Amino acid sequence: MGQKEQTLAYGTGRRKTSVAKVRLIPGKGEILINSKPANLYLQYNLSYLAAVKSPLESLGLANEYNVIVNTQGGGLTGQSEAIRLGLARALCQISLTHRPLLKSDHHLTRDARAKERKKYGLHKARKAPQYSKR
């Protein structure tokens, strides 16, 4: 059987400039990000790994599904939080009973914060040049 036939649910997550497309497959709890194991891709950073696994752990499903993720754009922080949102959305597709738990843990909330653009006449987005009275 091909992986397309086994796929239980899809979810897309976004954060900053990162986009993560998440697929859930029945399995033992393995997480692959861009064809690499999650801990290798996330450089063994425990906070990123915890963010990725948190929707599964809050439902107690950490060893029920294999997670296959394709991510693009941004850095590891944005990608890991985009994966978290995509995974939570995919889990909601599997069973609607998961939705209230995920919502109460804020896994279904899209974090809209992004870098503010630089304005002309300023050094950065809000940093103005030094004021001189005379």
Curated annotation (Swiss-Prot):
Disordered, as annotated region: 105-134
* HAMAP family, alphabetized: Ribosomal_uS9_B
Give GO BP annotations, semicolon-separated. Answer: translation
Q: What are the leading ranks of the lineage?
A: Eukaryota, Glaucocystophyceae, Cyanophoraceae, Cyanophora
UniProt record similarity statement: Belongs to the universal ribosomal protein uS9 family.
Domain of life of the source: Eukaryota
Q: What is this protein called?
A: Small ribosomal subunit protein uS9c
Bias (Basic residues):
115-134
| Originating organism | Cyanophora paradoxa
Q: Where in the cell is it found?
A: Plastid, Cyanelle
Q: Which Pfam families match?
A: Ribosomal_S9
Please provide the record's keywords in A-Z order: Cyanelle, Plastid, Ribonucleoprotein, Ribosomal protein
Q: Where is the composition biased (Basic and acidic residues)?
A: 105-114
Q: Which GO terms describe its cellular component?
A: cyanelle; cytosolic small ribosomal subunit
Q: Which SUPFAM superfamilies match?
A: Ribosomal protein S5 domain 2-like (SSF54211)
**Which molecular-function annotation in GO is an example for this chain?**
structural constituent of ribosome
The record's annotation in InterPro entries points to: Ribosomal_Su5_D2-typ_SF, Ribosomal_uS9, Ribosomal_uS9_bac/plastid, Ribosomal_uS9_CS, Ribsml_uS5_D2-typ_fold_subgr
Q: What is its main location?
A: plastid
